Amino acid sequence: MKHILCYGDSNTHGYIPSGGRYDDDTRYTGILAKLLGSDYRIIEEGLNSRTSSFDDPFEPYKNGMDCLVPCLDSHKPLDLTILMLGSNDMKVYFSPSVEKIAGSLAKVCQTILMVSEAPVLLVSPIYLGDNMADSDFAASFPPSSIAISHELGGALEEVARQLDIPFLDAAKVTLPSKEDSLHSVSYT
């Protein structure tokens, strides 16, 4: 049996923009499990508000690097880690930039490669929606964050190329919800 760890934020967790959590079969991890079949075990490690490596002053314990190594160790042996972080790194109080976020995610990928000794699939986050100003998250994600979300995919594709790992741009396969402009619409 192959073991795949999905390490991410609220979009991995399955956060529903109107509140709650998508059921197992609706979250991307559940869809992946169904598509791959019984020879694969999908391990879901999605945490709302998780950052790649930044300490959130309003939501402590969300720094993705802090729990990464224990998480990898607890799920060994792994055949693949799917890493989808970066959305929360765009919060205004982190003084975000494409370079800063890409650099942070490069370090996360390097840590995964070193600790798990298994491949990493780096997934760029979805775009932040154009109606973010009307969202409950508007104070954390100003227009500059929306611009970063549209540039991040290219920078992360370059990170993946440099690390010789596969890459997927989630913004090319799903959209932000109209409800909050941050979380993905249902994957089904």
Give names to the regions the model predicted:
Residues M1-P60, P70-P77, T81, A155, ...:
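Serine-esterase "nucleophile elbow" of acetyl-processing enzymes
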Residues S38, K62-Y187:
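Alpha-helical cap/lid subdomain in secreted, periplasmic
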